[in-house]
Amino acid sequence: MASFCASKFLPGLLMLGLGLAVALASSTPTLSLLKDNLKVMNMPLGDWLHILATNFTNFVASQTLLTLTIFGVASFILRYLYQLFLKPLNLDRALGDVGYVLDGKKKRDVVNDIRRRRKSGDLPPIYPNGWIPLVASQDLVKGDVKYISAVGNEFAVYRGEDGEAYAVDAYCPHLGANMAIGGMVKGNCLTCPFHGWVFEGKEGKCVDIPYQEKGKSVPAQAKVKSWSVIEQNGFVLVWHDVEGREPSWFPENIEEEKWGKMYYHGTTKHTVCAHVEEISENGADCAHLTFVHGAFMGSGNDLRYMGSKLWSWASHSWGGKWEQDPDHKHVGVMTVYHAFSLFGMPIEVTRTESTARQNGPAHVLLSFSLPFGKATIAIGVTPIEPLTQIVTQHVYASRFIPRWLAKSFLYAEYVQFERDIMVWNYKTYQRKPLLVFEDRLISKHRRWYSQFFSENSPKFEDMKKTLDW
């Protein structure tokens, strides 16, 4: 009862106390002296405050309702224009926010029910080998530590004072404390919050035990696993290979010589219930483009309303192909052809061609080329559980592409991607699907993706026995 009263009334009491303090302070000689002597453009601050307060009051009193309405609408328009032209797009959709049919039920109950009853199917290994995005670069500031659970491992990811990103196993080898929870960055090292052991990020060695007797050396076995890290395309990526092999390839960079520097314009993030391979496989499934993505964007992301007559006058026409890059076996390339149609007639000036380059199992660069520049959506898939992925998408554009246009590319991808999520959240994985000739690229893609699994890649059946995720 006492805690309830405190939580209910304490904020109000604090605000009342703050108001009284300000009122009392306003009458003190010190503040009066400050208002009289602190000058702005040779006029005492107190005079400025008096003029502003008087003029604002007189201005509001002299306005009609129509004038105030106009000012209100103008303010709304200015705010909208600021959001559109100056502010990056940032949208974060949690598990259950999209892709589930609630039918009046609580979101949490529906998500848990579907995940429990869903038939997983005969799954391939659950965590691929390769470069795995762990966190967005912008979310890891200097001196910050993030706790990331991904690909069956627990990571402490931090940014040192040198500006570099480091990733080590989260658990301290001393007594098992999670160093990402309360751990502090000291120089380029991570300090355990439990006993203060200090680990450097390059090799994971313990470099200091603060309470150890002077003159004694740190035990050689006092080290934590460190991971190979690169920072590229807006992501901090780690090299994950269950066989312990060193990196054999590296992701491509969004920047190229023709257009130079690429500028950031926004991020979207989704939590998806699917196997990691299914998200990549979507790029080779060209037949689904017409059925899932053909309806006009205005019809939204709910597949149940794609056939609404309200938006039947507008639609998207799609075509595409997928193939392995002949020079880089870890890269898959999808080419997408698109046109906007009105009343069934494609509008020629809207015809575009975009390219999605799948750099390994979990990183994609989706690029749109225009006569005056290039926009690229960098996509990162982070496997946090066998059937749960976090998909993050950043949009970048070259110098002469305005922010509103770059954001429109990302927003279009955002809406279309949420249509896919509604399928993924409910589907099962078919190890041996019934395919027709026109589906042949799906089989081709599965053979390509299999290179990212190896003999010791964890299986879903093994993980279910241990609940080790």
Swiss-Prot record:
InterPro entries: Cholesterol_7-desaturase, KshA-like_C, Rieske_2Fe-2S, Rieske_2Fe-2S_sf. Keywords: 2Fe-2S, Cholesterol metabolism, Iron, Iron-sulfur, Lipid metabolism, Membrane, Metal-binding, Oxidoreductase, Signal, Steroid metabolism, Sterol metabolism, Transmembrane, Transmembrane helix. GO terms for biological process: cholesterol metabolic process. Residues 1-25 form the signal peptide. It is a single-pass membrane protein. Residues 132-238 form the Rieske domain. Its EC number is 1.14.19.21. Its cofactor is [2Fe-2S] cluster. It is found in: Membrane. GO terms for molecular function: 2 iron, 2 sulfur cluster binding; cholesterol 7-desaturase (NAD(P)H) activity; metal ion binding. The keyword Metal-binding applies. Disulfide bonds: none annotated. Binds 1 [2Fe-2S] cluster per subunit. [2Fe-2S] cluster binds at residues 172, 174, 192, 195. PANTHER family: CHOLESTEROL 7-DESATURASE NVD, IRON-SULFUR DOMAIN CONTAINING PROTEIN. Belongs to the cholesterol 7-desaturase family. Catalyzes the production of 7-dehydrocholesterol (7-DHC or cholesta-5,7-dien-3beta-ol) by inserting a double bond (desaturating) at the C7-C8 single bond of cholesterol. Essential regulator of steroid biosynthesis as this reaction is the first step in the synthesis of the steroid hormone Delta(7)-dafachronic acid. This is Cholesterol 7-desaturase nvd. It comes from Hemicentrotus pulcherrimus (Sea urchin). The gene is nvd-Hp.
